[in-house]
C-alpha cells in the first residue's frame, strides 16, 4: 500500500519533471486522505490530511508528496505543467471485479448462494457512479491544459468530487438496494466479516470548491 501510493506518486512526478512535453497533470488520490474525525459534515480540501489505517495514511502521504512537487517544481505561472489533485468518493461502476468492493463482493457471494461479508454495515460513504468523478477529472484536466485559470486559480490545488451531502448512504442500505435486483439470492449480510479491520464510520465530502471553480456537480442519483 505505501509503496504503491507513496513511491508510485513520487516516481510519476519524477517522470513528469523529466518530460518537457507534459502540459497538465491531474492526480487522483482518495477521499480517505483526510484525517477522519467522524464529523457529520463534509470534509473540505483545507481540512487535515492523515489516516488511522495504512490505506488512508498512504493516501494522505501521496497528497503531501504531490503538493510539495507542485510548489517546488511545477509552480511557474507561465510554463507547464499545470497540476492538481483530486479526491473522489466511493465509486461504483462496470469493469470493477476486484476484491473488497461492495458490488462485486455482493455479486460473487450471492451467485454462490452465500451471505455477503460486510465489515461496517452502518458506515456512511459518498457513493457515486464512476462516470461522475471521471467527468470532473477530464474537465479539470482540460481547463489546466488550455490555461483556463480565471476567475479562480486552478493550478496546484486539490478538489473533492463526490455526491451531494444529503444522499450519503450506509453500506447496509447499498446492499439492500442491490438485493432488490437479485431475486432468489441470499441477501443476508454477515456483519461480523473482517470485523477486526479499522474503518471509520462517517465520511462525507464537501464539493463546493468543484462547483464554484469548475461548475461541476454530481448529477446522477
Model-flagged regions — what are they?
Residues 5, 9, 99-104, 137, ...:
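Amphipathic alpha-helical segments in well-structured domains
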Residues 38-40, 75-76, 106, 144-150:
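Short beta-strand/turn micro-motifs at beta-sheet edges
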Residues 90, 110-221:
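C-terminal substrate-binding subdomain of Rossmann-fold SDR/epimerase-dehydratase oxidoreductases
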Residues 14-18, 67, 71, 108, ...:
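Short, well-ordered alpha-helices that flank and scaffold nucleotide-derived cofactor binding pockets
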Residues 30:
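Residue(s) in the substrate-gating loop at a strand-loop-helix junction
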Residues 37-40, 96-100, 130-131, 171-174:
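Short aromatic-enriched loop/helix-cap "lid" or pocket-rim segments at secondary-structure transitions
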Residues 2-14, 18-24, 33-91, 97-98:
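Catalytic helix-loop patch of NAD(P)-dependent Rossmann-fold dehydrogenases
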